[in-house]
């Protein structure tokens, strides 16, 4: 078989790039800049078709069959039973033939998320093969880890609980060996998003209507405050290479070393989580940022504390009552639905800042420190275990009730402590421990993580150090972070604030329009249900009716208001995920009945959303800037 170094077919390459450009200018430009080298070759298979090969580890690896690449691709696709609404996470792109054959088995309800770990392979495939059909295919999402700095955030947009039973991995031949670590990272990221989706389900059920109400309040409130991106821009003007960020969490070991933290003030960026506020402030430490994201963060965390000069970080879930009562300076970030985030981006001329969720206020604080540009992050009070049989720092007091009763109520797991001893933790803290370990692995080239908790569970990948040693070795450069924060203005001028408030209120029309769309869809689908229940059934007419139903539902799914209204219809959406998406044996009548149940959930949700919108957004008597 003839082997040759692959040279660029510039005309074909540019044809493919022109198609890709329409989907992502950023990706197309990055691929155009890739330099061709001799590590990737082309080889003629036995049937004369060209395939890609790569030199790695002292040998040649074929990325498709050296006998018959089409037959091999067809055989690969036959392994997978494609289900309605299935989402397939494919690892590897090769020459595109495997993807093309897999796509042939899919319908309009399916999605392929194709991860190519080596951009050079993709670039050379674009120069060697006509990939226009794949590059413009809406059912394919291309994912390149080399270009994505927020892997979890990207995947979280794709994975939701309703389809959690319909997710499947498809790994191309040779890729699991050539890119074993990258493959594991991809799979771990997907699995973590699935866990997050399950946790989010329980969270939404627990808080129900509270979360969208919080979000609406913040959508209005933020107009008069600053955002965390503004802080980042101010920080980047300074040389912070030798300045660490210290995350102060509320574990029991915080009581051991909090008295030392005052020595780090002005030489580190100190982020305290809300539950650690009392212990931190009582030790004479004024944190540079107080992070609060719990929808039910209790007032007892803050009662009697002097918080007038404290800067807060808040997102769409933060308890508004706490901010109303205690916060005078707020830096916002988070996700406020597609519509409002797009309005913010258009006005600000940059994407509204957000971080990948981790499930706790400590993980949020970690991601904020990373986002702000700090490359040494120190953890204190991050026990992630019941150290000494205690759940939290003494500063919390009775905020969580009796300590022993609280621990007894938890699902207990055993973990290794920093000194090798076995400690008790609960499932929730174990989950956060896993999150930190994954984050440390993922960002290993960007950040150094030091665990100066001096107790608690061992966090794999974090350096162990005492807080005294951290202060001596890492906190050596003076930097007035408070003065830097004081210089950050509100994100909008006074005139722009009025304009943004007007834009926010204009969303009311979108809500009422959505209500009308849902009412019409329900009416039409009730007609369909009546029609297909008639005997004898007309198979052709039933197929047309079901197609019309799917078309109606697609229009509803693409409506921007759905991201808000679905927050009020969580039970209906999750019930749909547990039945219609997972049960392939539903009759046409059952399909329509399930669809109607969901639409009626949306109809109810739209009514509730409009009630909250009028009470929170349209209510001019409610003071905002307090």
What feature does the model see in each segment?
Residues 116-117, 276-277, 284-294, 372-395, ...:
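Glycine-rich phosphate/pyrophosphate-binding loops
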Residues 1-245, 252-269, 278-282, 298-309, ...:
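N-terminal donor/sugar-recognition subdomains of glycan-related enzymes
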Residues 125-127, 258-260, 282-285, 292, ...:
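Short acidic, glycine/serine/threonine-rich loops at helix termini
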Residues 111-116, 135-138, 268-272, 286-295, ...:
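Short hydrophobic/aromatic-enriched beta-strand-loop microsegments
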Residues 294, 303-306, 317, 324-326, ...:
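Beta-sheet-dominated scaffold domains
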Residues 321-384:
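Active-site/ligand-binding-proximal alpha/beta "capping" segment
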């Amino acid at each position: 078989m003839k082997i040759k170094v692959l040279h660029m077919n510039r005309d074909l390459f540019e044809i493919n790039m022109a198609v890709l450009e329409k989907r992502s200018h950023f990706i197309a430009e990055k691929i155009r800049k890739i330099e061709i080298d001799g590590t990737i070759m082309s080889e003629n298979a036995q049937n004369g078709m060209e395939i890609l090969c790569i030199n790695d580890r002292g040998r040649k690896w074929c990325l498709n069959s050296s006998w018959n690449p089409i037959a091999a691709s067809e055989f690969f696709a036959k392994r997978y039973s494609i289900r309605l609404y299935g989402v397939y996470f494919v690892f590897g792109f090769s020459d595109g033939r495997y993807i093309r054959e897999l796509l042939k088995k899919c319908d309009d309800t399916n999605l392929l998320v194709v991860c190519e770990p080596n951009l050079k392979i993709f670039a050379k495939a674009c120069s060697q093969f006509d990939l226009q059909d794949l590059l413009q295919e809406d059912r394919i999402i291309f994912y390149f880890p080399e270009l994505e700095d927020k892997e979890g955030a990207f995947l979280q947009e794709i994975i939701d609980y309703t389809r959690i039973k319909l997710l499947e991995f498809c790994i191309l031949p040779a890729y699991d060996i050539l890119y074993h670590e990258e493959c594991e990272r991809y799979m771990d990221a997907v699995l973590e998003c699935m866990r997050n989706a399950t946790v989010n389900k329980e969270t939404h059920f627990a808080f129900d209507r509270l979360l969208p109400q919080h979000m609406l309040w913040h959508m209005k409130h933020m107009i008069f405050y600053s955002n965390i991106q503004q802080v980042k821009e101010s920080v980047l003007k300074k040389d912070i290479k030798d300045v660490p960020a210290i995350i102060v969490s509320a574990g029991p070991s915080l009581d051991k070393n909090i008295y030392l933290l005052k020595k780090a003030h002005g030489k580190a960026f100190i982020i305290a989580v809300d539950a650690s506020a009392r212990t931190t402030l009582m030790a004479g430490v004024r944190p540079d940022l107080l992070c609060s994201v719990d929808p039910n963060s209790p007032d007892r965390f803050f009662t009697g504390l002097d918080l007038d000069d404290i800067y807060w970080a808040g997102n769409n879930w933060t308890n508004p009552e706490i901010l109303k009562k205690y916060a005078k300076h707020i830096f916002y970030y988070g996700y406020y639905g597609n519509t409002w985030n797009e309005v913010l981006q258009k006005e600000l001329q940059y994407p509204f800042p957000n971080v990948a969720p981790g499930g706790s206020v400590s993980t949020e604080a970690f991601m904020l420190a990373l986002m702000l540009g700090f490359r040494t992050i120190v953890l204190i009070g991050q026990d992630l275990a019941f150290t000494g049989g205690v759940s939290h720092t003494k500063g919390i007091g009775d905020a969580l009730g009796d300590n022993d009763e609280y621990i007894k109520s938890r699902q207990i797991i055993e973990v290794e402590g920093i000194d090798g001893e076995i400690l008790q933790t609960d499932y929730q803290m174990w989950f956060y421990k896993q999150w930190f370990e994954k984050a440390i692995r993922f960002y290993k080239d960007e950040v150094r993580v030091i665990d100066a908790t001096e107790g608690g569970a061992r966090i794999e990948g974090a350096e162990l150090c005492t807080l005294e040693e951290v202060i001596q070795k890492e906190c050596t450069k003076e930097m007035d972070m408070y003065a830097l924060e004081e210089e950050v203005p509100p994100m909008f001028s006074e005139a722009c604030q009025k304009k943004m408030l007007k834009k926010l209120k204009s969303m009311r029309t979108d809500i009422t329009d959505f209500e009308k769309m849902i009412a019409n869809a329900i009416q039409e689908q009730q007609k369909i249900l009546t029609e297909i229940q008639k005997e004898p059934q007309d198979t052709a007419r039933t197929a047309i009716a079901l197609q019309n139903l799917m078309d109606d539902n697609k229009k509803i799914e693409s409506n921007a208001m759905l991201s808000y209204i679905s927050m009020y219809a969580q039970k209906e959406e999750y019930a749909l995920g547990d039945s219609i998406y997972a049960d392939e044996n539903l009759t046409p009548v059952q399909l329509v009945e399930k669809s109607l149940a969901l639409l009626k959930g949306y109809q109810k949700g739209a009514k509730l959303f409009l009630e909250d919108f009028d009470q929170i957004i349209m209510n001019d008597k409610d003071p905002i800037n307090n």
